[in-house]
Amino acid sequence: MQFTPPFEQGVLLRRYKRFLTDIRLSDGSEVTIHCPNTGSMKNCLFPGEKVWFSTSDNPKRKYSRTWEQAESDVGHIIGINTGRANQLAEDAIKAGVITELSGYHSLKREVKYGSENSRIDILLSDDTGSTDTSFSGTPPTNTEPANTKAKPNCYVEVKSCTLLEEGQGYFPDAVTTRGQKHLRELMEMVESGHRGVLLFVVQHTGIDSVQAAAHIDPDYASLLTKAHSAGVEVIAYSAEMSPKGASLLKSCPVKL
């Protein structure tokens, strides 16, 4: 994923009211920008350190600038915009980086599914007759032999992981009833004969492994263990990030 134009740099002053952040620009002026992260952002807020932001030319926006990345007090880069995680995942699937999700013909985003009225982040299917053009004509990275049974549909729920504590990456950074619902929906898909995959997109260059934050949301941690035992696949991939672009490059261990 390339950022055009590249993100601009500022200095973090404060985050408040969840969606607002004050920064200092290179000319010394102070401005308020949009914070596209609904989580607690625990251990992601470092006043006085560098931040990077994008700028929209949409005149209807109250805040034209959006906080995208931050630098920690020890120099790690953190992806603040959780909305980037789904695109990073899609790009990596198309490029064949996420080997666990290769070989499908169709990729669709935000498809309704489940008994709790959710929308799956990514739906992969082996439907060669699909009108979906998400792969832009690119064949899957590993094709099935002719006349073999089609792959089961693969429901992929994407979560952005940015919480680093004592060298360990954790998800979530706050209690998430929505995340618990998504785990139940994935279990339901597995029970119906499909694949259910929880994909952690690690947007923190200091995180080397991921595990459920039982000390923050014990219900989520317990449900994740149950989901994994029920057949939900849990994987993580780490992002390389800069003001010019970002991409998922390598698998990251998940401690279950």
Swiss-Prot record:
Alphabetized Pfam families for the sequence: SfsA (PF03749), SfsA_N (PF17746)
Biased composition (Low complexity): 128-141
Classification via Gene3D superfamilies: 2.40.50.580, 3.40.1350.60
CDD domains from the UniProt entry: SfsA-like_bacterial
Domain of life: Bacteria
GO MF annotation: an example: DNA binding
Chain residue ranges for the region called Disordered: 128-149
Signal peptide range in chain numbering: none
Family, similarity comment: Belongs to the SfsA family.
Protein name from the UniProt record: Sugar fermentation stimulation protein homolog
Organism per entry: Shewanella sediminis (strain HAW-EB3)
